[in-house]
Amino acid sequence: MAVYSTNEFKNGLKVMVDDAPCSILDCEFVKPGKGQAFTRIKIRNLKTGRVVERTFKSGDTLPSADVADVEMQYLYNDGEHWHFMVPDTFEQYAVTENILADAAQWLKEQDVCVVTLWNNEPIQVTPPNFVILAITETDPGLKGDTSGGGGKPATLETGAVVRVPLFVQTGELIKVDTRKGEYVSRAKE
């Protein structure tokens, strides 16, 4: 297993902290006028999602986290588990709701997501950056509504609610940015 020194820390690096896989979100090298230099990092625990700040003396090391990001296809939800499959090997994984978190509202069957595996167990699911979903319910638009005139809430086929321009109607397909949960544009069928 690889070991990273403090001078090798960078954003996005996956390391083990307190026996849990973590991802470095922010890394800052600090050299005070008096005393030893140190590195301050902000890390996200990949299992719990909690973000904490830690300080390491210059020369400290952390082991690498044995995590793998695998592209998987979302198959179905059986009520308590969401099922994903690796397209190449047809290997299937079941993911619970607490691991899926907010990603569940953007998943449509057959979508390809990135699933983070640790010890061959899924610990995080990242939906595609943009998804195309149908609007199942929204207020009717009136003649003369334009894109600059504000917005209205719309319920999508997955149950997610996003703000859309006034001219968008029920039944239309729209493109949504899953990172922000915002309407991007209309989509062609």
Swiss-Prot record:
GO BP, sorted A to Z: peptide biosynthetic process
Record CDD domains: S1_EF-P_repeat_1, S1_EF-P_repeat_2
Chain positions with N6-(3,6-diaminohexanoyl)-5-hydroxylysine modification: K34
Keywords, comma-separated and alphabetical: Cytoplasm, Elongation factor, Hydroxylation, Protein biosynthesis
Pathway noted in the entry: Protein biosynthesis; polypeptide chain elongation
GO CC annotations on file: cytoplasm
Predominant cellular place of this UniProt entry's protein: cytoplasm
InterPro entries, A to Z: Elong-fact-P_C, NA-bd_OB-fold, Rib_uL2_dom2, Transl_elong_fac_P/YeiP, Transl_elong_KOW-like, Transl_elong_P/YeiP_cen, Transl_elong_P/YeiP_CS, Transl_elongation_fac_P
UniProt modification remark: May be beta-lysylated on the epsilon-amino group of Lys-34 by the combined action of EpmA and EpmB, and then hydroxylated on the C5 position of the same residue by EpmC (if this protein is present). Lysylation is critical for the stimulatory effect of EF-P on peptide-bond formation. The lysylation moiety may extend toward the peptidyltransferase center and stabilize the terminal 3-CCA end of the tRNA. Hydroxylation of the C5 position on Lys-34 may allow additional potential stabilizing hydrogen-bond interactions with the P-tRNA.
Lineage top rank: taxon: Bacteria
Family: Belongs to the elongation factor P family.
Alphabetized PANTHER family for the sequence: ELONGATION FACTOR P (PTHR30053), ELONGATION FACTOR P (EF-P) FAMILY PROTEIN (PTHR30053:SF12)
Role noted for this protein: Involved in peptide bond synthesis. Alleviates ribosome stalling that occurs when 3 or more consecutive Pro residues or the sequence PPG is present in a protein, possibly by augmenting the peptidyl transferase activity of the ribosome. Modification of Lys-34 is required for alleviation.
Identification of the protein by name: Elongation factor P
Species per Swiss-Prot/TrEMBL record: Legionella pneumophila (strain Lens)
Highest classification ranks of the organism: Bacteria, Pseudomonadati, Pseudomonadota, Gammaproteobacteria, Legionellales
GN (gene name): efp
